[in-house]
Amino acid sequence: MNMPKGPLTNILVGINVLIFVLVWLGGFQQQAVIEGALIPARLTGALGSAGAYDFWWPAWVTLLTHAFLHIDFSHLLFNMLILFFCGRFVELALGWKLMGLVYLTGAIAGGLAETAWSPGSLNPVLGASGAIAAIIAGYMVLFARNRPKPVGPLPAEIARGAQLLLLWIGLNLMMAFAFGGDGIQIAIAAHIAGFIVGLVLSRPLLILRYRNA
């Protein structure tokens, strides 16, 4: 299989890796979490006295910044390998602008979903979970080997989307069960929200791209 070039994909991978290296070499891990991670209670205004801290930027900015921070090297490596492979194929189909839209929308949706799930939580949310989930869904939709088939009253595309979503939810629940005992927190809400973004946006954006070509 020939790998598409994917310039935006390479840039996104490069940015994520560069930020990780700078944070860890500079010893800025704690500051990066405080300033860049998404803290649901901060976004909802439920921080209480802790909200008096002089943050660098408004809480809404962390809907994006959290997606460029990673807990450790294995977290970064896992996300970047998926992005490196799936991202360039989605970019091939949609073009760099629309692929970037899917990626950033997935990141924001993931952050909002985690906030809605635990609005008063002080646990920081880090990682490109929502963005990567959106790219995975886009890859599954745009490069499916078999044509979708209707299921009962459900049209083919909706039926396939529902099947993929159920599969994705099941996979995430299995991951949470398998790794939860090791203290690893799986951002299930972010994964699901990002995946839905990819399911919903990918084919309409593909049609839009070639309609305007």
Annotate the PLM regions.
Residues M1-A213:
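A detector for small-residue-rich transmembrane helices and their helix-helix packing motifs
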